[in-house]
UniProtKB/Swiss-Prot annotation:
Main location per the UniProt record: secreted
Biological source species: Helicobacter pylori (strain ATCC 700392 / 26695)
Protein name: Flagellar hook-associated protein 2
Family statement drawn from the similarity comment of this UniProt entry: Belongs to the FliD family.
Annotated gene: fliD
Localization in the cell: Secreted; Bacterial flagellum
């Protein structure tokens, strides 16, 4: 105790010093603090041991919970013959054999677009143009600027479609090995990419269809398309369909009738053959699409065109160029040219002109030029079209070059899709997007993907290749007992790890008087007996006595549990319903017709464990909380005892110091008197 050093008290006495105080304090600490420390150590040991027991019980609860779950007993597994598909099955699927004939796999659209290049950094186009295509019920127009590289164009396609259609630069080999590919991310016929122009129908007419000529001799339905000679040609369509035909059947018949009519016309025969013009059904046959990948106009003519579902009977032409801004007001200077035809801006505009007046004057001048037309759109901006689909814009002098900006135009060449198709957008379809087609136990089915999970609930199929005729893939669905076997194996392991720990912590040796840390805790001492009581549970049925021993579980004389897996498998295979009833439970009706559920043995195990560790009112949780409270109380008691001793011995030290001072003064006085006595004695001598 580092308070200081006291001299002895009393004449010649060395009793009152700090060594004495420390000895007194040590004695008090042994009497007050040491018992508290011992209790705190025991509390920590109990909390640690309790955590271990709860952990072991949680490990036991895992397999018990599985074995008390109904889904465990209706678990299924599948086996597939052949390589055409893979399959997985969920719980409760009826045990059966499923025959699957795979005619077609779903696939995405793969297209080559444009010429080949020596590098992905080569310039794709020297002109401004627009790539037009349609897929997934949406039209896309990808703006391509002069000077963009092959890689830039590929990325622009991907970005414009949010990755639904991917522009890919592929190295295919040769002197110019790089090729732009336009592919769809997803499979299915609705993911087909249609370049150029298209018309689409949505047929709802359930009546009979008769397509021929009307009273005036005109075709009731005809197709008006650009032929191989570049001119528009009209082709009549003839067809008779009964009322009984479905929408899909009608669209398929219309498709074939249109294709046949075009194939029979020399203007279109080769265009149908090479895919420049195509007619397809979409959306499971609910819709029909006519496509001209050259970008030409498509028109469905005749009095019955709308009866075929063509609400829009002609394609809408896209404008070639829209200015980036409204034309500047006031007088504009300089000369500009459109396709070589000059416009003198100073002659067309005045200082007092508004933007609208300048726009009207310039539009009038453009419309007077050969092959050009212009108008003002709803935004007040200049729109220019060219009969050839090509427009070259140029500033003819310095003022004209500067004034292009005031017109919202840029110098250069602009081409329509149709004008660019033969040079930039020549496309070749390498793989046509299509649905998968297969039969499921004889029923014909189509799906947009090869992942099929909606034919029968719980059966998931992945189509991988087509099957040979009359050699279907067979999915055999059978009972899966492995989860039961695995859970029982885990149950035995967890039980055999828990029991030795319980024995150790609750033991009592009468000879040595040594007791386990939980020897006096009834809730923990009762765990083993509670589990063993459930283990010994049996029930009489029509099939005899049901007990865990029947399923290969047993306890030896040392309390070690074992599992005879062969015996378990035999019992599971011979009567799975009896296993389910004994392990999980069974349902029946009482005399009044009410449903009652008889709990199985593992439901009983689950309840025993839940009462111990689940929730705030679980027995071990309550005991754990009591240990926490005891720990806090002991800590507080120790702090109070330490504070008491500190105060007591601080006061004692202060008093000893005062006594020491008084005795020191008395000693000094005594020494003075002694000196006087000694001096007097010396004089006498």
């Amino acid at each position: 105790m580092a308070i200081g050093s006291l001299s002895s008290l009393g004449l010649g006495s060395k009793v009152l010093n700090y060594d004495v105080i420390d000895k007194l304090k040590d004695a008090d600490e042994k009497a007050l603090i040491a018992p508290l420390d011992k209790k705190m150590e025991q509390n920590v040991e109990k909390q640690k041991a309790l955590v271990e027991i709860k952990t072991l019980l949680s490990a036991l609860k895992g397999p018990v919970k599985t074995l008390s779950d109904y889904s465990t007993y209706i678990s299924r597994k599948s086996n597939v013959t052949g390589d055409a598909l893979s399959a997985s099955v969920g719980v409760g699927v009826p045990i059966q054999d499923i025959k699957v004939d795979v005619q077609n796999l779903a696939q995405g659209d793969i297209n080559e677009l444009g010429a080949k290049f020596s590098s992905r950094d080569d310039i794709f186009s020297q002109v401004d143009t627009t790539l037009k295509f349609y897929t997934q019920n949406k039209d896309y127009a990808v703006n391509i600027k002069a000077g963009m590289t092959l890689g830039d164009v590929a990325q622009s396609i991907t970005d414009a479609t949010n990755g639904e259609v991917m522009g890919i630069v592929m190295k295919t080999g040769g002197n110019d090995p790089y090729q732009l590919m336009v592919n769809t991310k997803n499979t299915g016929e609705d993911n087909r990419v249609y370049f150029g122009s298209h018309l689409q129908s949505t047929l709802t007419n359930k009546n009979a269809l008769s397509l021929g000529v009307d009273g005036s001799g005109k075709s009731e339905v005809s197709l008006n398309l650009k032929g191989a000679d570049g001119n528009m040609h009209e082709v009549p369509i003839m067809l008779e369909l009964p009322e009984s035909a479905s929408i899909k059947q009608k669209n398929t018949a219309i498709q074939k009738a249109m294709e046949q009519a075009l194939e029979n016309d020399p203007n279109f025969k080769n265009l149908i053959a090479n895919g420049d013009i195509s007619i397809d059904t979409l959306h499971g046959g609910e819709s029909l699409i006519i496509n001209d990948r050259r970008g030409g106009n498509i028109e469905v003519k005749g009095s019955k065109a709308k009866e075929l579902g063509f609400l829009q009977t002609t394609t809408q032409e896209s404008d070639l160029l829209k200015s980036s801004r409204t034309i500047k007001e006031g007088k504009l200077e300089g000369v500009v040219s459109l396709n070589g035809q000059k416009l003198d801006l100073s002659a067309l505009t005045k200082e007092s002109n508004t933007s609208e007046e300048n726009t009207d004057a310039i539009i009038q001048a453009i419309n007077a030029k050969e092959g050009l037309s212009a108008f003002k759109n709803a935004e007040g901006k200049l729109v220019i079209n060219s009969k050839t689909g090509m427009l070259t814009i140029k500033g003819e002098d310095a003022l004209g070059k500067a004034s292009l900006k005031d017109l919202g135009l840029n110098a250069g060449m602009v081409q329509s899709y149709e004008a660019s198709q033969n040079t930039l957008f020549m496309s070749k379809n390498l793989q046509k997007a299509s649905d998968s087609a297969f039969t499921y136990n004889g029923v014909s089915i189509t799906r947009p993907t090869n992942e099929v999970n909606d034919v029968i609930s719980g059966v998931n199929i992945t189509l991988e290749q087509t099957t040979e005729p009359n050699k279907p893939a067979i999915i055999s669905v059978s009972r899966d007992n492995q989860a039961i076997i695995d859970s029982l194996t885990e149950f035995v392991k967890a039980y055999n790890e828990l029991i030795p720990k319980l024995d150790e912590d609750t033991r009592y040796d009468a000879d040595t008087k040594i007791a386990g840390i939980f020897n006096g805790v009834g809730d923990i001492r009762a765990i083993r007996s509670s589990l063993n009581n459930v283990f010994s549970y049996s029930v009489h049925t029509d099939n005899g006595v049901e007990s865990l021993m029947k399923y290969g579980l047993s306890l030896d004389d040392k309390g070690v549990m074992s599992l005879d897996e062969a015996k378990l498998s035999s019992a599971l295979n011979s009567n799975p319903k009896a296993t389910q009833d004994f392990f999980y439970g069974s349902d029946s009706k009482d005399m009044g017709g009410r449903e009652i559920h008889q709990e199985g043995i593992f439901s009983k195990f689950n309840q025993v464990i839940a009462n111990l560790i689940d929730g705030g009112n679980a027995k071990l949780k309550i005991y754990e909380d009591s240990l926490d409270r005891d720990a806090k109380s002991l800590t507080k008691d120790k702090e109070n005892a330490q504070e008491l001793l500190k105060t007591r011995y601080n006061i004692m030290a202060e008093r000893f110091a005062a006594y020491d001072s008084q005795i020191s003064k008395a000693n000094q006085k005594f020494n003075s008197v002694q000196m006087m006595i000694d001096q007097a004695a010396a004089k006498k001598n």
